Amino acid sequence: MSAVRAVWNVLVPPLIVGVLFVGTWEIIVRVFDIKPFLLPAPSSIWTTLGDNWSKVWDAMLITGANALVGLLFGVVCGVALSFVLMRFNVVNELVTPLAVALNAIPIIVLVPVFNNMFASTTEVPRRLMVTLIVSFIVLLNVAKGLRQVSATHMELLHSYAASPSEILRKARIPNAMSYLFTALKIAAPVAVITAFVSEYFGGSQNGLGYGITSNAAISRTAASWGYVVGACLLGLAFYLAAVLLERLASPSQRSTHHQPTNQQSTNQQARGLDPGGATA
């Protein structure tokens, strides 16, 4: 019963807000007689989306593939670089400011550059753009998780003469996991946004970005909004996948009644490092 109530509390409030927003939008368009090419009514968008759903779905698959490939490569690159930054302070001091500065550059500035570097008709520039954005998000978060380990845990492990690799395995990596999943939940929808915005500037002519711009250019605003809805659904799917992955990888978060405290857990881990400790 509590699980049903929890789901109810999570899903119902956003649904109510969404229904109120769409209803208000519909009323405003009809009352003020706003022209469809300026702002179509949600009912018009829904009808057009139904008529063109096969095209929108195909566009979602293309943009989703670019976002997924870039997301996977970005996570791998970000995690790998975070270990390098954790290990070498000099590299951390050099790379972190550069990563922050590059992350502040708008997507619309870098995509044309990548299109010139690679063939604009391929998906490489868009996937590379997603990889770059995602890797920065993952890098900054995971590097922070690897470094900001509890001082108590570190002192306890040092008291057991733990080696750097043992500290990494028993303290730093477990601490960084929550940072990784936080970064993943941020990066997943950002990957979709980056993928379809990158399509504004070339590449495949059947992705979500091209569908938005091409329909807007000929004043088919309702059709353009249909592709926007497709982008929203795709971003939501990526986010929910990240949340599900976190739940599957961290089952202890669902039930903590019989879990030891952080201090007890560290003590148990550290005993395995002490030759004279308990082995039971």
What is the role of each PLM region?
Residues W8-V31:
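N-terminal signal-anchor transmembrane alpha helix
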Residues N116-M117, L146, I193-A231, R254-H258:
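Glycine-rich helix-loop "coupling/hinge" segments at transmembrane-helix boundaries
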Residues N89, S178, W225-A280:
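C-terminal transmembrane helix and the adjacent membrane-cytosol boundary/short C-terminal tail
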